[in-house]
Amino acid sequence: MPGYSEFYFNVDHGYLEGLVRGFKAGILTSADYVNLAQCETLEDLKLHLQTTDYGNFLANESGPLTISTIDDKLKTKLLTEFHYFRNHAFEPLTTFLNFITYSYMIDNIILLITGTLHQRPIAELVPKCHPLGSFEQMEAVSIASNPTELFNAILVDTPLAAFFQDCLSENDLDEMNVEIMRNKLYKSYLEAFYKFCEKQGGTTAEIMKPILEFEADRRAFIITINSFGTELSKEDREKLYPTCGKLYPEGLHLLANADDYEQVKCVADYYAEYKAVFEGVGNDSGEKTLEDAFFEHEIKLNVLAFNNQFHFGVFYAYIKLKEQECRNIVWIAECISQRHRTKINNYIPIF
């Protein structure tokens, strides 16, 4: 028998939860991907997508289809759905949905700074940013020469200001410092999101905590592996790890002292969930990568979110599943476009 709070949940959030579950029913199945992978041209792909929930989302494209057009339209469709959720949400769901956008904002800022470091014009970089993470001051990012300047001139009035306290320094924004800044921002963001979900309690906390714990631990594994062969010290590396995952504290300390991939794998062996992820990784170039193995595990966690009702986790899970779906469609489209059919089935199906 549902408790009072669950009945109350439906008063403010029931309509949107029902809607997101309806949208989830339109996510492409394995059979849809088999059909897409058999397409010979991008026009064939467009016709097949018209038979799914994507419908006529490419109908207004009169010229020859390109990968970037397909990618843009997929993101625009997801953005439209997300804006509908947020525009009709009540607190605390509104804040929860805003939290989802912050990771995209971080990625956009890093993309713009990195592009500027390589003398790329800002007008060329902005279209590459994810629309879920766009904000008004975005184009001004290129004027900052160090993190403190970036914060004071641009980010102080954005939601990311709260995550920026650990990033403030006078160090020049070179590639190494930009990566450190990305990881510090993500650390603060994930820890804040975790606390917010914990505060909501109930099923939202029950569903979201394992998802965010996995995200925190995935970042710790990737930070460790990417730091091998760089100037980053073990002490500095440990400061970048989010502390809201299952690895905290012992696992993170072991990762901080790891010297190579095998030692990272040994740390994963202590955690059944991550041992299975690392065991699924192939050694040859054509086999499954660690990134793919992490994506597969993420999909499982997000699909599980739909097994419970009366919680916010379904909104996060839906956005992440659609993001993977977009990656799958773009991957298949690229293989068709480049006539690289041997790898066309290397997508990650959701259902």
Curated annotation (Swiss-Prot):
Presence of the UniProt keyword Ion transport in the record: yes
Q: Which classification does the entry list for the species?
A: Eukaryota, Metazoa, Chordata, Craniata, Vertebrata
List the protein's name.
Answer: V-type proton ATPase subunit d 2
Q: Which gene encodes it?
A: ATP6V0D2
Q: Which family does it belong to?
A: Belongs to the V-ATPase V0D/AC39 subunit family.
PANTHER family, sorted = VACUOLAR ATP SYNTHASE SUBUNIT AC39
Which is one Pfam family of this protein?
vATP-synt_AC39
Superkingdom per UniProt: Eukaryota
- GO molecular function annotation: proton-transporting ATPase activity, rotational mechanism
